Amino acid sequence: MSQKAVAYIDLLGFSNCVKNNPEEAIMMLTHFNTILSSLNFEREVHPSANYIAPLQSLARRTSNESFEHFMPFSDSVFIASSNCSDFLLQLGNFVKDAFLFNARIYAHPENPADPTATHYIGVDPSNPNDVIDIPCHQPPVLFRGGVSYGDVIETTPAALFNNQRYICNNLMGEAVVRAVKMEGLVKGPRILFNDRVYEQLNAEAKFYCRLVPEKDENGQPLGLYEILWPAMGYITENRELFVQEISHFYDLFTPAYNLWSFYKSNKDVAIQYERFLELIVTSAIRIYDYMGYGDYIHHKVAETLKSKFTEEERLNIFEMVI
């Protein structure tokens, strides 16, 4: 038994995707596995300690070097680490990269009426001389989950796969149970954590977090925190290039807005993107306030929201930041 941070993250919308088109659901899994493979390669070939001193902090934040266990099952993943601070930063970066992997499709949709619509171009398996062009959809890869800290026990239970016996790896303990319970407490692609995790964080990690603004059924604060994971893409070391850094805001906001517009008539889905958009805006404000350019980002945000939303929509979605 040891003390670890444990994250439980789940793909939003995966169940509906499996029901409607299993092949597109498999594509969602393939995308985040591709990102994981890339991070695994980087940690082996270019560990953050090998970078020059000014870049080591950035390299560490964008790696997965703190991931000790990464255990996927269907659309869910358990991840564990002994280093809470690095873990939260790197988990946030992983979630950010998962969405950005195909976000360009939604930012510049082939069919504005459906930003997930695209096509697959490849070689015809039955005739290698022919190119095939198949219409398809690419659902966004967005995670929601929880992180807890506490006792974790690593076990190796017996299992079967394709009638073959094998020994699998498993995690159990209080931290695992608490992480799973947090996953569905709020709407949107958000990663929550409790005060036990917060107590373990250094100042850098705390900067990328906030108290969850939602209240419980009695109107009381939930008493939980969340990772401002859209903030992970900004290079805070580039203060002099703050105008260029605004591109990251639009890299996230534009595809999220187009997806919200597409699902706007479906309230159950739309609210997921409304919470996502608010998280993107809050994260940008946090970064630019830190860099000393708060007035700049507030102007850009106000300008963007005014051009995209009605006054009622702005008040409903962004009441916590405007």
What residue ranges belong to the model's regions?
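Core nucleotidyl-transferase/polymerase catalytic module
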Residues: Q3
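Catalytic core of nucleotidyl cyclases, primarily class III adenylyl/guanylyl cyclases
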Residues: V6, E44-F87, I105-L171
